[in-house]
Amino acid sequence: MTDTGPLQPDRPDLDRPLSVDAPFEPAGDQPDAIETLVAGFESGAEKQTLLGVTGSGKTNTVSWVLEELQQPTLVLAHNKTLAAQLYEEFRELFPDNAVEYFVSYYDYYQPEAYVEQTDTYIDKDMSINEEIERLRHSATRSLLTRDDVIVVASVSAIYGLGDPANYEEMALRLEAGDERSREDLLSALVELNYERNDVDFQQGTFRVRGDTVEIYPMYGRHAVRVEFWGDEIDRLLKVDIVDGEVVSEEPATLIHPAEHYSVPDRRLETAIEEIEGLLEDRIDYFERQGDLVAAQRIEERTTFDIEMLQETGHCSGIENYSVHMSDRETGEPPYTLLDYFPDGFLTVIDESHQTIPQIKGQFEGDRSRKESLVENGFRLPTAYDNRPLKFEEFEAKTDRTLYVSATPGDYERDHSEQVVEQIVRPTYLVDPDIEVEPAEKQVEDLIERIQATPEDERVLVTTLTKRMAEDLTEYLENAGVDVAYMHDETDTLERHELVRSLRLGEIQVLVGINLLREGLDIPEVSLVAILDADQEGFLRSETTLVQTMGRAARNVEGSVVLYADETTDSMAAAIEETRRRREIQREFNAEHGHEPRTIEKPVSETNLPGSSTDTDGVADVAPDTVDEAEQLIERLETRMQEAADNLEFELAADIRDRIRELRETFDGLEDPNEGVPSPDEEF
């Protein structure tokens, strides 16, 4: 195992066994699930499914399984928001191990495209988040230097990445006492794609001060100071970026490239020769087709890229030449994050019923966009090799897989050696009781149920359309119900405030369309009402119904009412499954003498800018002067960075938007520094 050196101050640097630090022991069905899953993998099972009901502690169960298996693990989530939540949970559960985060580093991403119908070329446009880029480099570095690694990732994990062999081969090892001149070090850093910048010291740069060279690696929060005595490295120091204070002295360190697509000089020369040869063939192809515009276009664009590669070792869109930068052939699977893992790693696919379809859909969407670029002379055909993995390639690269879901899909069930159920919750809560009522007078019945709900309990109502939700909210208000409406345009600040208001009793009812996407796990909710439950479709599928019913499973008094004029197949299956689980839970509690208890979850101050409970004063009244606006923006920027550091990307983006509004209102204020994640969608 290679030394990691002093570059990871935010997590331990030494290999340790994966060890869970939890304030509680496994309970409910967790002990049996852990034992069964571990035994399955140890006996040779390649694929298993953990079917865990809402609130059963699936993440904790997975953590205890990892502790038993002691293997590097990839945890896949279907969006950045869920990945961030899992990342925080695993970091808390494994404080002494390398828990890493790997998602798309784009705040904004417009892929390169060409629209033939209108002869419109759309150049690639993007904004990269530096903190997420740092975390991506931290993830790949950890995978190549230690074993106790858990990487939480989105579907970015199946998109092209640089050759891990190049990334590892080019790593620069420095030791105190090495015979190496300052000039040799500077040359080596340039080859690793680090840039010299003596003024603006940021990630991926180095600066020189006399006999001292300071390097700010892509993957750490501290810099490395290299002090020379003549042509010998005298000392290696870890230093604070802000004040320059020495944190520690280190005997050695390992500097990995600043770009995942970095390549050794000899490989780059070969790549350029291959690109030049392919370019000649492509020009001939277009000329034979009589398409002189495309011939000129591909020649100009590719020649410029070649010149940049020759001068700097890098070019914009270098990923489109990735097949030339590695030892693979055209058509072979691209190198991805999965190739940085050692053999025999474990893959955990969270919310597999959503993540599996997402993985399956990535390749075709990417291919169709690139066809137009290649056929019209904007890219060489090898651009096709810069792509996500096909699903069968993903399967081939993952050895042992654990699917995790409350509602596994057919794929998981068909491909798993066993499906392990986790039905009994650690809190011993049972699934809610279910009633089906006619849809004809659903609103009148709903109002009666709301009025019968105790003051300390809450109600969630889900409708099919935005218009229905708005009309219902207005009707309930006129009937004297304290109600609010949550929809897809409700931003993070409003969502936090709405949920808090519901929990505090400021409102009793929350109406929404797809309550699943809101992540509403509220212990006070004792009634979930599903209107028009017999309208087949995504929002009323078996999976969605089971998930929505689970929103009432955190309260002892939890119940669900489905309004329908007929019982659809989806309804029947969802009701049967929920009642089956409820019976198992009740039998377990009776046999072991357990009393269900409502989950206790304190209602904390949201302290979010723009909220009524903003105790930091960020949510000031609208400023009247430029000075007031500048003061408010300064506070908002501090909160924005805190949110980004905590991986609360949607919140950070909403604060960023508030800053932009203030700057537009008060002319003359400088533009905000970009670098805060936008709400998630991968590509």
From Swiss-Prot:
Residues 39-417 form the Helicase ATP-binding domain. It is found in: Cytoplasm. Residues 442-604 form the Helicase C-terminal domain. ATP binds at residues 52-59. One of its GO terms (molecular function) is ATP binding. Residues 1-29, 587-620 are annotated as: Disordered. Keywords: ATP-binding, Cytoplasm, DNA damage, DNA excision, DNA repair, Excision nuclease, Nucleotide-binding, SOS response. Residues 604-615 have a biased composition (Polar residues). InterPro entries: Helicase/UvrB_N, Helicase_ATP-bd, Helicase_C-like, P-loop_NTPase, UVR_dom, UVR_dom_sf, UvrB, UvrB_inter. A motif (Beta-hairpin) lies at residues 105-128. Pfam families: Helicase_C, ResIII, UVR, UvrB, UvrB_inter. CDD domains: DEXHc_UvrB, SF2_C_UvrB. SUPFAM superfamilies: C-terminal UvrC-binding domain of UvrB, P-loop containing nucleoside triphosphate hydrolases. The UvrABC repair system catalyzes the recognition and processing of DNA lesions. A damage recognition complex composed of 2 UvrA and 2 UvrB subunits scans DNA for abnormalities. Upon binding of the UvrA(2)B(2) complex to a putative damaged site, the DNA wraps around one UvrB monomer. DNA wrap is dependent on ATP binding by UvrB and probably causes local melting of the DNA helix, facilitating insertion of UvrB beta-hairpin between the DNA strands. Then UvrB probes one DNA strand for the presence of a lesion. Belongs to the UvrB family. Forms a heterotetramer with UvrA during the search for lesions. Interacts with UvrC in an incision complex. The beta-hairpin motif is involved in DNA binding. This is UvrABC system protein B. It comes from Natronomonas pharaonis (strain ATCC 35678 / DSM 2160 / CIP 103997 / JCM 8858 / NBRC 14720 / NCIMB 2260 / Gabara) (Halobacterium pharaonis).
